[in-house]
Regions:
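Hydrophobic alpha-helical transmembrane segments of membrane proteins
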Residues: 1-90, 100-265
Length: 265
């Protein structure tokens, strides 16, 4: 039943997520093409300032479209969570033959997946733009000595990264936990706003989110100040601990609020 619930969540949002990804990819294509045109065709800049201005404006709009689409993915998954839990659709959701844990986990997993898909699309768009722009670079003018120097520099970079493998893993773990905890904070804020302050749910959600964020920031600063020579590691450790606490406590509060306040248990 949990798999069916995930499938239902995906079917409800796949068109919107696909649209956001398409907007991002098309924007990346246009940004790369615009950069290619600006470098390759002098007529767009020297010969016709109007066309050059249009190309620059188009590239700026596309960059804004990428940023807005990434932000929209977060707002969309929160809106979907609110709609499927705290509206008329939500009452139908809670009549499904699954427990509250499955309902929360399905929303959490699908929200994370949908945001991740949009972010991956943004990464592909950046690679696409850089790839198109690289076509106008004078690769043939780069001599073998320059390529050898680049290869040596990359080799040295790889060696340095290998020496700091544990640090890289720590940073990666910090980023993953921070992303999950932020999503939990957002879902908790929506839950509190919808249940505690029905007249002003958005305002309450904003207050709760920033309240938790400020508390976590204070704890992270304390870890940085008291860390001494290992201040960076101490701060990262404190961030990971606060993220884990946020994930556990936030999930428990969401479960309790949706279960007890809506008389599900």
């Amino acid at each position: 039943m949990f798999a069916k619930l995930l499938k239902y969540e995906w079917r409800s949002s796949r068109k919107t997520i696909a649209t956001l990804c398409a907007v991002i990819l098309i924007s990346g294509l246009l940004i790369g093409s615009g950069a290619f045109a600006m470098v390759r065709w002098d007529s767009l800049t020297d010969g016709s300032e109007v066309l050059g201005t249009i190309v620059i404006l188009l590239m700026s709009v596309c960059m804004m479209a990428v940023a807005v689409s990434c932000a929209a993915s977060v707002f969309y998954v929160l809106w979907r969570f609110y709609k499927s839990r705290f509206t008329e659709e939500g009452y139908l959701t809670y009549t499904l033959p699954v427990n509250n844990h499955f309902l929360i986990l399905s929303s959490l997993l699908m929200s994370a997946l949908e945001i991740l898909l949009v972010l991956l699309a943004a990464g592909v768009a950046v690679a696409l733009a850089l790839g198109i722009f690289s076509l106008c670079l004078p690769w043939k003018e780069i001599g073998p000595d320059a390529w050898n120097a680049i290869a040596r520099a990359l080799g040295e970079l790889g060696n340095e990264l290998g020496k700091h493998g544990k640090d890289i893993l720590l940073l990666l773990m910090t980023a993953i936990l921070a992303g999950i905890s932020t999503l939990i904070m957002l879902m908790l804020s929506v839950t509190v706003g919808a249940i505690v302050a029905k007249k002003h749910p958005i305002l309450m959600a904003v207050v709760v989110f920033y309240g938790i964020g400020i508390l976590r920031s204070v704890l992270n600063v304390v870890g940085l100040i008291t860390g001494g020579e290992e201040a960076v590691y101490s701060a990262l450790t404190m961030m990971n601990i606060s993220s884990l606490v946020t994930i556990g406590a936030g999930y428990a509060l969401i479960y309790w609020l949706t279960g007890k306040k809506l008389n599900l248990t």
